[in-house]
């Protein structure tokens, strides 16, 4: 290693370790928010990948996932499992969007235990797209398709569609993602 390579290797190792060393970091600054988002994604991704791996070991296919597995989202923090399951089905197992969406929506369920706005997690969309670009792409597509369906059902009712949208005013609304997924 040259000094530059060694320093970079140590920085990468420290970045990887911090994910599990600091639980619930302060999120009153960008670094804390990025760490918290990274932690949430790390835990969701590991969980969904484990579920998929176990399912594949038993059944060897994923088209029957909703018949054998139920993933219940009990808070807004793990709502990233919706786009993460989509990512795995599309990117790793070559499902079409429609096939992946059908499997995802039949596998996921969500219970909300509060209606207090401050308890319904949101993320700054630019921070989100910086940290999780592929997940952001998937959420944008989910949102676009959902808003089109909402427009078809409630033509001209922008207020209603805006209230239900995942992406709004530069924010990613996790409860809306969980409900739609």
Regions found by a protein language model. Give the residues of each.
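A conserved ligand/cofactor-binding region detector
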Residues: 1-181
